[in-house]
Amino acid sequence: IYDTRRIRKGLPLKDPKTGLHYYTSGYDYTKMNNGYRGFQGDFMSNGIITPGREWTAKLTEVKYVYRDVNFESFYSRVLTLKNKCAFTNLADIYDLSYEVLRNGVSVEKNQVAIPSVLPGKTCDINIPYTTAVDDKAEYVITFSLVLKKATSWSKQGYEMAQQQFKLSAENVAGTSVADPTFVQKDHGKLPAIEEKGKLKVKDNTITGKDFSITFAEDGTLANWTYRNTQLVQPNAGPDFNGFRRIANDNVNLGATGGVAENENKEEGALTGKKMMVKAPKKQGKNVVVETAVTNGKDTHQIAYIIYPNGTVDMKVTTNNSSEETRKIGIAMQFAPGFENVEYYAKGPWSNYIDRQRGSLLGLYKTTVDGMFEEQSAPQTMGDRQGLRQLTLDNNSTKLQITTEGMVAFSLSHFDDAQFNYDVFYGGKHPYDLVRSNQIFAHFDFWQRGIGNRSCGGDSCLPQYMTPTGA
């Protein structure tokens, strides 16, 4: 939606303070409908591109759904394609290329010819990749169909469809990375940690070579420095966080899954009652700490193991009593300066448990600001599924996070609390948000499916509901 007063030469203007566009949405015109939100709100701003005609994560998913070819299977080096076109032979319009990735890094690329594939028919294509696949790394193969010739709407070589499959040393049928269950499967164990060196414990402070970690009395990780560099914002270590605000979530559920949206204060979703279960104590050469957060019926625990070399091992255990819970995970704030981001997960656009088929597993480089999504109505954003490894860099110090099990993450310079506003009558815009220097990070076991119904609630499918129990 454009406000014509904020357009110059056909382009939307930007706010000089934030650099963000002056986009408006249906929420800005509620008064024109006598104060009733019907057919205003996000009915007026929920397209698959932005008002400035820019690409979005939604468009990535829609492109996957509407493609005219199916990658049926990949087994024993044979790719099976199905032509979904009504009149066109695949061989007439597409070239096929493939790329092998080892832990997200490209190790082999090539191109093969597509045989004649009539409409509605399938074909088998031998893929002669030469990479030796072993159990020491994660291997996937990415297939891409690109245009043979330029068209009136696209250049030659434009990628029209893509699909990834996991490779294994056993040469069994490759699991499709597009399958939502892919990120729910175990992707490997954390490596063993060497225990060389010594640690000192005084009160709730653990000190090792070049680093220091302090816990508050309630179990909060209050301070973490490495070579005099602050890694975590003071008193903002890992804490339970179940908050999510998406404008078209079910109005009657709100962000927590149990409070009317226009009355939702969110305190219960943001944290709970904290406690130190086990104060810092030496265990061999290491130090162990256990903390917990109780939120209503649910208790969430973090068991820390701190090693002499500075590695911190966190085992997060959660308990959830409602499938309507919006998120199960932890939030924390990294210190200012760690702007450079490298992550091994599904990307490069944001993706969710029920909207990730168009996203590819890979090693991506970006910045925290680069992960911000300029949505017409500010809301929870930026999730990436299947996190394996994340590295934050402030140009002098690198902080690396490696995961085991199912983890999704997001990074932002904007506090989630800013999304806790009256969506329908608040009229907030991205340029209204206050940017902080620190980095707000989320690491989630599960985020409830976004759903896909424009009226009467989100209609989240059963398999994407938040699992209950421990």
Each language-model region and where it sits:
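Edge beta-strands of extracellular beta-sandwich domains
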Residues: 152-165
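Intrinsically disordered, low-complexity Pro/Gly/Ser/Thr-rich segments with frequent PxxP/GP/PP motifs
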Residues: 99, 103-153
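Extended substrate-binding grooves/exosites of carbohydrate-active enzymes
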Residues: 1-76, 84-92, 97-106
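Short beta-strand and strand-turn-strand segments in soluble, beta-rich domains
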Residues: 92, 100-112, 158-159, 457-460
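Short, hydrophobic/aromatic beta-strand segments
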Residues: 88-96, 110, 154-155, 323-329
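Surface beta-strand/loop "capping" patches
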Residues: 55-94, 179-208, 316
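Hydrophobic beta-strand positions in extracellular immunoglobulin-like domains
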Residues: 81-85, 100, 129, 145, ...
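Beta-strand/loop-rich accessory regions of lumenal/periplasmic or secreted enzymes
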Residues: 128-136, 149-151, 168-470
